[in-house]
Structures are given as C-alpha cells and as structure tokens.
C-alpha cells in the first residue's frame, strides 16, 4: 500500500505556530488547490485541503509563508477522530513531510502590494518612447 499526497496551491491564511502540551510545535493550514476543469458557469473551482506541519518544518513554514503564498506540499493523507459533546467527528488532513515555496521574494512582494504584471495598465505616450 502507498499513501502519498502532492498538492500545489495557495495558502488561505498565514499559518500560525502553536506549541502543544508536550512542547512540540505544530502549524495547521488550509491550501486552496484549483481543480483542473471549470464548472458550468465557466469558473474554476478550488478544493481547500487541510494540512498539518510538525516540528522544525512548521517553524520554517511559519517564518517564510504568508496568506496567498504559492507552495507545493508533499505528505501523507491521515484521518483522525475525536469526540465532541458525545458525537464522534472525523477529520481528514495531509500530514506534511516537506514543502516548497514556489514564488520568489519579488513575486511575493508584488502580490502582497497588489501589483500585477499586466501591461494593459501601462500607457506610454509617443513622446516618452526612446526611439
């Protein structure tokens, strides 16, 4: 049997580092991953994947990632259950074993400042052209 998850998407929110009762660091995050097809309205839908990151990997992720960061994750699919008010709840999430940020610092800064590479907004008059 083989349990492997690879996903590429954007962080829904900035991940937060939490320390457990046993002094271990954990970060929980949601990764928005676009589907390969468009719906009947012509829009692309996304799945929101729950991801858990432990230890030094969690510390590193929290230090460098922010809301909207494009990243890939590699891990295993896990299902856990817990009891709340007498009802058993099941949670399926990805246990992240590695990640990679897929945008440069410059791309991240442009995204965070809402700057795009869209040349449509750029208007040059003939007098300003160097030729």
Swiss-Prot record:
GO terms for cellular component: nucleoid. GO terms for molecular function: single-stranded DNA binding. GO terms for biological process: DNA replication. It comes from the Bacteria. CDD domains: SSB_OBF (cd04496). Keywords: DNA-binding. InterPro entries: NA-bd_OB-fold, Primosome_PriB/ssb, ssDNA-bd. Residues 1-103 form the SSB domain. PANTHER family: SINGLE-STRANDED DNA-BINDING PROTEIN. NCBIfam families: PRK07274.1 (NF005579), ssb (TIGR00621). Homotetramer. This is Single-stranded DNA-binding protein 1. It comes from Streptococcus pyogenes serotype M6 (strain ATCC BAA-946 / MGAS10394).
